[in-house]
Amino acid sequence: MKLKKLLLSVLMLLSISGLQAQSLSPSTQIHWDKGTLVIETPERPTDQQHVLGLTAPKMETVRVAFVGLGMRGPWAVWRFCNIPGVEVVALCDYEEDRAEASQKYLRDASLIPADIYSGEKGYETLCQRPDIDLVYIATDWNHHFPVAKYAMKHGKHVAIEVPSAMNLEQCWSLIDLSEQTRLHCFILENCCYDYYEMNALAMAKDGVFGEIIRAEGAYIHELSAFWKSYWQDPNDNDTDNLHWRMKYNMENRGDVYATHGLGPVAQCMDIHRGDRFTTLVAMDTESFVGKQYVENLTGKEPKEFRNGDHTTTLMRTARGKVVEIQHNVMTPQPYNRLFKLTGTKGYATKYPTPEYALSGDVMKDTAPNMDDINAHSFLNDAQKEALEKKYYHPILTKFGEKGRAMGHGGMDYIMDARLVYCLQNGLPLDMDVYDLAEWCCLSELGALSMDNNCAAVTFPDFTRGHWDEMKGYKHAYASAEEEEATEAKAEAYTIAQKEVAAAANLWTLYDNVKNAADEKAQDKALKIYQRAKAKAHQQLAKKLKVKK
């Protein structure tokens, strides 16, 4: 009770000082037990069931709307324009011109123009539409949760950029919504789809490293060149002109961006699929660089800078394994996500160069010169090439080549294409709402640890008792016949969409609306465009019906 009062006092003080300590939840129930801070797991309401292995009916066409079109959102629109069987229905951003700018990707792909939404509550009008299946959220962090919550309450699946939830209260709310609505709540963790991580996952699942007993992950990325590029929310009381991300770091302690490092190693360690995180301890440095940045910008030293320059979180699992996660966006050093797996038979490490070390005859009959393998040194190039060829992940086989052509290392496209694949085939998604909660809760749990002299803090069981029912992490696949049929329908849809858009001359009519001389002319042009677009959708439905 004393701790609860202390936390509430801290939150009130931060509120009075203008800070929004979003990594702390007033609703979190906590108590001490023998020096450990115990986070209580709320009971599941009687009318809810878990969503492990959740599926939704197959979608021949995935109708998607995008909310948040600043830094990452526009590239997501571009990627979806290159995935067959998708219709981009709507584009939304607080600033209308940013939403409008992303139309160029649909224009370049000769697709039907999307509808535009803007303003503080534009996403609410968007979510009320009946013709949207998926809302793809790439806003600033503060808006991830409210947009997702509203979308799910209006019957939409959601895919949320990271971090998808900022505290435990938001984690539990998304879990309850997914369980109540039976809708997917997908964390857009692209690093789970990078090539080295996917191949290492395939190796781990086949026992190449033996039992994985320890793992490391990180987000180490000096962001000094980006701080001013982040959006400045006019409603966020940003009087010091910090822009949202630096402001969030100043106001919040803990690993506020854990998922890039944690997601891939959690999959390798079967988290909530036979094991679960039970306890963490977090420790951070003082803020040296962050605090100095604010002082240089404002001319005065900040009263408080909550986020340390480097944060380290150690976690233990129910099966006695350990994971270490680091966060540093302040100090100058090469980009690094660590990704290290320590197993009873081998070791994998991605940075600074991707390597493997194996013991015994793990690679028997796989690569040349196997007699001299031992774990005292990394595999040579020929051995490494043979290992990666043998364990090249099936998802990379399907999407990897096009992914590389789409930029950013390919992992973003692979993530989006795989998401659409699962929705079109009615399969469980690769990450569920429990993954989202487990990977995003480090911010609040770590802050609680560090605010209490780096005390041990327990994890709640986000599955509420079901973490040991699924044995091992795995991806779901359709049969070859089902894949072929689904892909044929998807390709046919995209071809037909392009044909009706061209036949109706939609982009010329769209431009007529934008270039109208006055309001009266614009109203007239808008009516002509809307009639043509409605007719194009009717023609599209007819084309697809004939092809069936």
Curated annotation (Swiss-Prot):
Substrate binds at Y219, R245, Y257, A258, T259, H260, Y335. The keyword Signal applies. NAD(+) binds at residues 71-72, 93, 141-144, 161-162, 190, 240-244, 257. This is Glycosyl hydrolase family 109 protein 3. PANTHER family: BCDNA.GH03377, GLYCOSYL HYDROLASE FAMILY 109 PROTEIN. Its EC number is 3.2.1.-. Pfam families: GFO_IDH_MocA, Glyco_hydro_109_C. Glycosidase. It comes from Phocaeicola vulgatus (strain ATCC 8482 / DSM 1447 / JCM 5826 / CCUG 4940 / NBRC 14291 / NCTC 11154). InterPro entries: Gfo/Idh/MocA-like_OxRdtase_N, Gfo/Idh/MocA_oxidrdct_glycsds, Glyco_hydro_109_C, NAD(P)-bd_dom_sf. Binds 1 NAD(+) per subunit. The NAD(+) cannot dissociate. Residues 1-21 form the signal peptide. It comes from the Bacteria. Coiled coil: none annotated. Keywords: Glycosidase, Hydrolase, NAD, Signal. GO terms for molecular function: hydrolase activity, acting on glycosyl bonds; nucleotide binding. Its cofactor is NAD(+). Belongs to the Gfo/Idh/MocA family. Glycosyl hydrolase 109 subfamily.
